[in-house]
Amino acid sequence: TVTGVQTCALPIFSLMLYYLSPFGLSKRTQVGMQAPAGMVASQALETPEGEVRIALNGVESGSAASSSTSVQHVAFQTDDIFETAAVLSAGAFAALPVPEAYYSDLAQRHDMDEALLAALKATNILYDRDGNGGEFFQLYCLPLSSGLFFEIVQRKGGYSGYGAANSPVRRSALAQLPPHRPTPLDPKKAEIHV
């Protein structure tokens, strides 16, 4: 069951000041990641209790550097990502296919239960764990033609990050999509109940 909107990612440069004061948000650590379009900066803003989280993203250099103000992605929070994945896959949701090598690498990086690893792989769910044992699960849809994509997330054990370790995997999976890919929602099955 989806319990709410977890994160909304927006362009970084034009919106940071807008969100800081009026909404009582504070900056978290800024992360920089290399991408084919240039260096991507991601600045997380949160309320003190973490009930509102906004990730501002921007390409700092390269041909894709832009001051666009459109929403780039929306993440929805769930209490059970595997149940939500099953409901979505039975409906119109098309998950972003995760490369097979990701799960082999994941098994090497974390001491993981084989059943959990198999469940992640079967549902194209990404995983991260912090130094305190907090866990983060991510499920992405295929992007819309505008570039907007949706994500389902589940946090366990106080994980407070955004899964930055999985960002290169998501970008790699996107790069492997065929030019004429399916849409994230099949119009014949466009009604989803979660």
Would you name each region that the model predicts?
Residues 9, 35, 56-60:
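Contiguous mid-protein beta-loop-alpha structural module that forms a pocket-lining wall or clamp
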Residues 5, 29-54, 86, 91-194:
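Vicinal oxygen chelate
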Residues 81-84:
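Extended, hydrophobic alpha-helical segments in both membrane/secreted and soluble proteins
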Residues 28-30, 60-65:
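ER-lumen resident redox/N-glycosylation machinery signature
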Residues 10, 74, 147:
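Terminal peptide-recognition signature
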Residues 1-8:
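Single conserved hydrophobic/aromatic residue that forms the stacking wall/gate
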Residues 11-27:
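Amphipathic alpha-helical segments
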Residues 70-78:
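Acyl-donor binding region in acyl/amide transferases
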